[in-house]
Amino acid sequence: LGKGRLPLLTRFIRLLGLIKAPILQLFISYWGMHIKQFEAFLTMPASYQDHHAYTHGLLIHSLEVAELAYSNAVRLQHSSIECQVALVAGLFHDIGKIYSLSEAGIYGYQTGAHECLNFALLAEPLQQLAIADWDCHRMLSSMLAPYARYRSEQYAIEAIFRNADHNSCQSDRARQVFADKPAHYRFTKAGNQMVRRLPSS
């Protein structure tokens, strides 16, 4: 990690420590067994010119989604296993974005159906999870798949996860819009939209 980024790794390790369920332990050990993928995950941007489109952006976005999804699930009194599944989904929901670098050696963000590539990278732990607990596998797979509003099966915990993803994206977009603006600016244009904020006092 670059200078000043050690707190990101600390946050990452803290989140892994919250995953207690035996059936989810493979998602912790995944990183130790896939060093090339882990290095790509730490450094890549989360998008091309949208949210978190900078070095370490994918890691930052994944941490934010995992933290928001887990804390909201706990606050809304979901079961311990559902809270942990939401956390795992937050950490891994965009892992498909590293595929071009880790598997093909292509540097720079590549657009595409990254949700589908999630399953290519996570085939091993997902297979083991399917054997150990099919319902848990089905829930996590639903979160890792492309969003489908009218899917026949719906999970309340998935809505919490999807909202966490949306909130992380929107907050970063707002930060980037104001990044080169004076601290006192309360609004600015982004495309055809007016973006507003309350500046720090």
Segments the model singles out, each with a brief description of its role:
Residues 87, 100, 104-107, 129-185:
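Histidine/acidic-rich helix-loop-helix segments that form or flank divalent-metal centers
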Residues 61, 87, 114-118, 156-159:
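Catalytic-loop motifs flanking and including active-site residues across diverse enzymes
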Residues 1-107:
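Acidic/His-rich, divalent-metal-binding segments that scaffold phosphate/diphosphate chemistry
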Residues 74-78, 127-132:
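Alpha-helix termini
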Residues 10-17, 104-123, 183-200:
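Divalent-cation-assisted or electrostatically stabilized phosphate/pyrophosphate-binding catalytic cores
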Residues 66, 85, 115-119, 123, ...:
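An amphipathic alpha-helix signature
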